[in-house]
UniProtKB/Swiss-Prot annotation:
Name of this chain's protein: ATP synthase epsilon chain
Gene that specifies this protein: atpC
GO biological process, one term: proton motive force-driven ATP synthesis
Family recorded in the similarity comment: Belongs to the ATPase epsilon chain family.
Assembly with partners or alone: F-type ATPases have 2 components, CF(1) - the catalytic core - and CF(0) - the membrane proton channel. CF(1) has five subunits: alpha(3), beta(3), gamma(1), delta(1), epsilon(1). CF(0) has three main subunits: a, b and c.
Organism: Listeria monocytogenes serovar 1/2a (strain ATCC BAA-679 / EGD-e)
Gene3D superfamilies, per the entry: ATP synthase delta/epsilon subunit, C-terminal domain, F0F1 ATP synthase delta/epsilon subunit, N-terminal
Length: 134
């Protein structure tokens, strides 16, 4: 089986550069599995985990929105933010989740920006999920 050159980049710089046999990502249209030779595409990403099937097993990256471009044997992900599972501070992620839940509760009571609170909660849960998947 061939391989894919994968790049995950945020405005702050590269998060992942490497080779994978498969990339699995959740787009706005649903989950996609990308193998070498996949048709070219550009797809908006949801807040979710990008799973990279590599020789040593699987790597998870918490991606918070952005776009995925597939072109030949290359997969480029331009993410709003992204963190590899080994870089996630679980205590910080748990605190962010708690703050987001509290903000969401206040938002419902005070009719303030509920959408922003829901997004913050999704991002925190996504980071926790990436860190605790094993």
């Amino acid at each position: 089986m061939g391989s894919l050159n994968v790049s995950i980049v945020t405005p702050d710089g590269p998060v992942y550069e490497g080779v994978a046999q498969m990339v699995i990502a959740r787009t706005k249209a649903g989950e996609l599995g990308i193998l070498p030779g996949h048709v070219p595409l550009v797809a908006p990403l949801k807040i979710d985990i990008v799973r990279l099937k590599v020789e040593s097993g699987e790597e998870w990256v918490a991606v918070n929105g952005g776009f995925m471009e597939v072109n030949g044997e290359e997969v480029n992900i331009l993410a709003d933010t992204a963190e590899r599972e080994q870089d996630i501070d679980i205590d910080r992620a748990e605190k962010a989740k708690q703050r987001a839940e509290e903000e969401l509760s206040r938002a419902k009571e005070q009719k303030v920006d509920e959408v922003m609170a829901q997004l913050a909660l999704q991002r925190a849960i996504n980071r926790i999920h990436a860190k605790e998947h094993n």
